[in-house]
Design a protein with these regions (language model features):
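Residue-level signal for threonine
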Residues: 13, 36-37, 162
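Short, structured protein-protein interaction patches enriched in aromatics and acidic/basic residues
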Residues: 32-47, 72-90
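Glycine-rich, aromatic-bearing surface loops/beta-hairpins
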Residues: 76, 85-173
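A general structural signal for short secondary-structure boundary/capping elements
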Residues: 54-58, 78-79, 129
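Short, surface-exposed loop and linker segments with low hydrophobicity and enrichment for Pro/Ser/Thr
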Residues: 1-4, 66-79
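N-terminal interaction modules that seed assembly of large macromolecular complexes
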Residues: 24-68
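Short, extreme N-terminal leader segments that mark the start of a protein/domain
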Residues: 1-29
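Generic structural signal for hydrophobic core residues of well-folded globular domains
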Residues: 21, 64, 85-88
């Protein structure tokens, strides 16, 4: 019988995808991810499971902006990446004090076999993502114009890639 898993959305960068392809494993940055937790379900009084999961996914997409703001992504500094994983439930630890969807992954290392999907900003989204990366800190501090710019980036479509496409995505994009 297969172990019970939970879908976790991990914020990433394109460089992290390259590392996953080349090394066959990757650590979630600081062990953090986002998932449908009891706190997130409680937060939503309406909505189905898919809508609630999308909220966790969006949290990961916003966190990808923060990773890009660090400035160490060289290949695609203006493309968000979210990695969807299926992780054994015993490795997923909700952290409601950090946010309704926040989970700590222990261990934080995952392999390509755990991939459920890869999501990457499309080229047309790069300008909005660039602006959001520049303004993410101001948005966190309540600047309304910055919040709108971040919201515009989050509204942009992220392309879906099947886990089997990881090598091609890294080599051909």
């Amino acid at each position: 019988m297969a172990a019970k898993t939970e879908r976790v959305y991990v914020p990433a960068t394109f460089g992290m995808l390259t590392e996953l392809k080349e090394n066959g494993k990757l650590a979630a940055r600081s062990g953090w991810g986002f998932a449908v937790t009891p706190a997130l379900q409680e937060f939503y009084t309406e909505g189905d499971e898919e809508e609630i999961a999308y909220s966790a996914y969006q949290e990961a997409a916003m966190s990808s902006l923060r990773l890009l703001a660090i400035g160490d992504e060289t290949d695609f500094p203006h493309r968000r990446v979210v990695i969807s994983l299926d992780v054994p439930v015993e490795c997923v630890h909700p952290q409601p004090d950090m946010g309704e969807a926040v989970v700590k992954l222990v261990p934080a290392i995952f392999t390509p076999e755990q991939l459920a999907a890869i999501h990457v900003d499309i080229e047309e989204s790069e300008e909005a993502t660039k602006k959001a990366v520049e303004l993410i800190d101001a948005a966190d501090l309540g600047d309304e114009d910055a919040e709108l710019a971040v919201g515009d980036a989050l509204d942009n479509f992220m392309a879906f890639y099947d886990p089997s496409e990881l090598p091609f995505l890294v080599d051909l994009l």
